[in-house]
């Protein structure tokens, strides 16, 4: 049976992170993460096995470059074909749901965890957490930070170094600190590439004007 603090954590209420059940769950995650990060580069089968044990759900064709960090792992649900570059940090004190075909750049932080603004509550050791959802087809650039309670809509692009503190709609490019929508994703983003017959041709006029950073 889950403890009161575990239930409070997953429900967006204040909780004590030093609850014995939470401490034990974090230790379990750290052991699995340690083994994952220390695995030999060629031992992909071991990493897949460890990831399936660590995460609440892991779809087909996922690959997360080590090293990675998370708090619990069990609150993370990955769709199919998720790719994360080096140094992903996920503070999954609340649910983190990542859809299919999501790309995550290096040094990205996904943080469900927060602390009260009131210093008295902080001194009591109270924390809170809010769920994060990253929908299908999203690309998150390197060094971006996703704050508690955020939803990023389908196929959107988050520019490198952005700090996402509010929901981002589907099919947009959003950049900055705080992150703001700068334009929609359109057919021109496909047309910028002169792919030729085999889909591997050179750039027609360069992607820089259309890049999120």
Where are the regions a protein language model picked out?
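A contiguous, mid-protein "functional segment" used to position or interact
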Residues: 163, 169-181
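Short-chain dehydrogenase/reductase
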Residues: 63, 139, 157, 173-175
